[in-house]
Amino acid sequence: RRDIRITQCITDAKGDRSRPPGKQDDPDAYVHVVSRQSDGVVIRGAKLHITGASLGHELMTIPTKAMKAGEEDYAIAAMIPVNAPGVKIINTSYAPRHHDLRDFPVSGTDNYPEGFVIFDDVFVPNDRIFLNGEVSQASVFAHSLGLWERLGGLSGMADGADLLVGLAQLIAEANGLAGEAHIKEKISEMIIHATVVRACLEACLMHAEVGPFGAAFPNELYTNAGKYTGAANFNLMVRHLHDIAGGAVVTAPAIADFENPEVGHLARKYMAGRSDIDGEYRTRLFHLIRDLTADSYGGWQLVTNIQAGGGLYAQRIVTRRHYDLERAKQVALAAAGLGAHPDH
């Protein structure tokens, strides 16, 4: 049985962002066709930020944006084997290096290589090409990835928001401050954020639309509004968590320090919070908070929360496009007693 893993590759190197693909000083700034022959094409360029590129079997390479007349060579979409001649992948990772993985409870085990995928004159046979010069269809490919990427991001944000709430409550209890009004206020705001993000996730699935071939697509309005809400408010939720937890988020002893015969018992003594809270227990909470929000995984998440599936501006555009603004205008006119809009 073939268990083929496909990695979608969309974001180009882009070069000068103020110029379209066809007006770059370096034509390779966007993946494009450099030669055509009867049995296929040869492509050149690079795709950036491709999570897990080296772990899959196939690279589904698609345009990163809409193309126009004159940019036919950039309107290329194809399925390329990861080991095809000319494919080169540079990997980076936020995995901790040379550290005790007990101090990195998330990034020590859950980490992904980020691939910088280079197509150095790669031949693609005709039967692996989906789009070949049809500029009017380039944006369809680009948009299709954005929707699913944002749905995945929204799903992760919903679970992640609940995790931040749980950590905030646990560390507040360990610190003996769970009853303080300002702590409860911050956690309440985190709870509201988590609830709204999950509500958007559930709404986009409940209002999914079924296409002509039977495939279900999440509702674009709720998907994009939810992704925007989760990303735009993430930093504030992390700030609340850090404020509740305290400076030990970045200064707590390593787990190995508790095993040191000279200082282990002292670390356990002074890292304790309430009398019934063990010092190592509290320290492990700090390590999880640090790893999630202020270190290896946390740094990666801070960026990907904003950039995955397109930045905040992209979500604002799509949300506005799918919101029924005309209906809202009619509701306002009716409320004002003005009847129908003059344009109708």
Please tell me what each predicted stretch does:
Residues 1-44:
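Gly/Pro-rich turn-and-neighbor structural signature
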Residues 4-6, 39, 57-59, 74-78, ...:
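Structural beta-strand/beta-sheet cores of well-ordered domains, especially the beta-sheet scaffolds
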Residues 46, 50-99:
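A short core secondary-structure module
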Residues 221-344:
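Alpha-helix capping/hinge segments and adjacent helical runs
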Residues 185-210, 228-236, 240-242:
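Loop-to-helix element that buttresses phosphate recognition and phosphoryl-transfer chemistry
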Residues 100-195:
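Glycine-rich beta->alpha junctions and the first turn(s) of the following alpha-helix
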Residues 184-188, 216-224:
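Short, charged, amphipathic alpha-helical segments
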Residues 169-178, 201-212, 244:
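Secondary-structure edge/capping motif, primarily at the C-terminal ends of alpha-helices
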